[in-house]
Each structure stands twice: as C-alpha cells, then as structure tokens.
Design a protein with these regions (language model features):
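Small-residue-biased structural context
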Residues: 2-159
Length: 159
C-alpha cells in the first residue's frame, strides 16, 4: 500500500456485475470466478493465488474455446489468437522475477481486471450474442480435451 504523505491507497478491486454476463451460464460462472481470484490476490498469498488464477485461466480458455469450436463460431481463430496473446502478456508480466510488493500486486490486479473487462465486454459478448442467436438450448457443461489443456499449459509455462 502506497503511503505517500501518510495517505494509504485503497486496493484496486473490481467486483463482478451482472452487466459482464454474456448469457452462457458456464462461461459467466467461470468469468465470475476469475474476478473472485483477482480480488483475492494479496501480498501474503500472491504466489499461491497467481498460480491458482493461471491454472483456472487455462481451464476457462480451454472450455470457452471448446464451445466456440464445437458450435462453429466463425471468429474462433481470431479469439484463440487473443487468448494466446494474453498468455504471452501474462508470461512477460509475471516472469520478471520481481519480488511481490503491494505495488506489484495492485499492478497485476489492474492489468488482469482491465484485460478481463475489455475482453469479456467485446469479444466474449460478441460470441455470446452469436451463440444465443443460433442455439435453441443452453449448452451442456463442457470441458476441454487434455490436448487443448496441454497447449495452453505450455503457453503459460505451467507443468
């Protein structure tokens, strides 16, 4: 917490809102969980929370991509590329080897929240609208194949 001139800076936290929903229940639940993990990030448990967050991002991206591919989403390849670019940004951002400080925790929160909101409110919302226009029933919960997880796991450098 920055204490310039004796003033404590409040933690950077963005709460999940219904306005972030894309109307696909599983994806919305996964997005909400991502927000909860970002909110839980703190100096005392930074490494543990970041590892849990990255693991869950891999699962979420895999599930979302599996649904896009299965449904024939025409912008699937572009969306996949956005996920890959995010992975590269995260690897660069977190791979610096810097020690955790309150400022770094806040920077990571800011980065993740900004990316999540921007991505959900543009690209995922576009997919949600496209999907709803073409589907008569809600999708069954999906889980990506191990092969897809393996690719994303390698992308994030996780074992």
């Amino acid at each position: 917490v920055s204490e310039a001139f004796g003033v404590r800076k409040a933690p950077f936290v963005i709460e999940w809102r219904d306005g972030f929903k894309i109307s696909i229940a599983q994806i919305d639940a996964e997005h909400q969980h991502l927000f909860q993990l970002v909110k839980a990030l703190n100096l005392q448990s930074a490494d543990q929370t970041v590892n849990e967050l990255l693991d869950y991002v891999v699962t979420h991206f895999s599930n979302e991509q599996a649904l896009m591919e299965k449904s024939g989403y025409p912008s699937f390849e572009q969306h996949l590329k956005l996920h890959e670019e995010f992975g590269a940004q995260v690897a660069e951002f977190l791979g610096s080897g810097e020690d955790w400080t309150e400022e770094r925790v806040q920077d990571v929160r800011r980065f993740l929240n900004k990316w999540l909101i921007g991505h959900i409110m543009t690209h995922d919302l576009r997919f949600g609208r496209w999907y709803k226009e073409r589907q008569l029933t809600a999708p069954k919960p999906i889980a990506a194949s191990k092969e897809q997880r393996g690719f994303l796991t390698r992308l994030f450098g996780l074992k």
